[in-house]
Design a protein with these regions (language model features):
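Extended, well-ordered protein cores
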Residues: 1-246
Length: 246
């Protein structure tokens, strides 16, 4: 994966793109499996609310059809531990929408168990974005697609698990390191069951691969609300510019 979404600026709107590749999932490797097992040990990775066996069965069958050689039992939790991606299921019923199940080992600053049961608006209310059309967006996610969207962050380390309890390393001008963390979010709908699968897939862009001027431009063009949400300030941007001699 070589897509650099920061080149298009920073946007918190739910910009859905038609899926660009038939690949939904990647089978896990030993490095990521070890990190997932550490997450299982140290934090809550699975939660559910008002789920049905019918939905679990349909989604698990879909995953098995996409990835060869997965090992039984073909349960949601067991399959999630065999994939690079984290998995979330969102439902709509009787005019309501909510996150009904989540198996997330690598959350980006949030608690999976707190998101489960929340509506789209409740989950995203602190993000500077327009969620006025959240209900329409949820329906589109189910009946259209499949979709993908990309979100990105700047980090000082290659950190897969950014759970709120995990300590982060601050930028050190004397020993600098910079990564762009990209989260590819894949949305696949199941119209008959009124739900969609949300797969979260991370990859890292190393410092020597970053288009540094494009990244600085994207950071400078953030709104004050976006900068606050991403914990970015002008001082940090200036440190990056100095580090890269821009």
């Amino acid at each position: 994966m070589n897509f650099h979404p920061y080149k298009e600026g920073y946007n918190t709107l739910p910009k859905l793109l038609k899926l660009s590749t038939p690949i939904f999932f990647y089978k896990i490797n030993e490095e990521i499996l070890k990190l997932k097992l550490e997450s299982v040990k140290n934090q809550t990775v699975f939660a559910e609310k008002d789920m049905t066996e019918e939905i679990y069965e349909a989604i698990c069958n879909f995953i098995v059809s996409q990835v060869p050689d997965l090992k039984p039992p073909y349960t949601f939790e067991n399959l999630a531990m065999q994939l690079v991606e984290d998995l979330v299921i969102h439902r709509i019923k009787d005019g309501k929408n909510w996150t009904s199940a989540a198996h997330v080992c690598f959350p980006a600053g949030w608690y999976p168990e707190k998101v489960v049961g929340q509506s789209f608006f409740e989950t995203h209310c602190e993000i500077p974005m327009n969620v006025a059309n959240g209900d329409k967006l949820m329906k589109a996610a189910i009946v259209s697609g499949p979709f993908e969207r990309f979100v990105w962050s700047v980090s000082t380390e290659k950190l897969w698990n950014r759970h709120p309890t995990v300590e982060r390393k601050k930028f050190d001008p004397k020993n600098p390191s910079v990564y762009v963390i990209v989260e590819r979010q894949i949305i696949y709908g199941f119209p008959k069951l009124e739900c969609f699968l949300f797969a979260l897939q991370q990859y890292f862009i190393a410092e020597d691969e970053i288009d540094k001027q494009a990244l600085i431009t994207a950071l400078n063009n953030m709104t004050p609300e976006q900068m606050k949400y991403k914990s970015i300030n002008k001082e940090y941007i200036d440190m990056l510019k100095t580090h890269w001699s821009l």
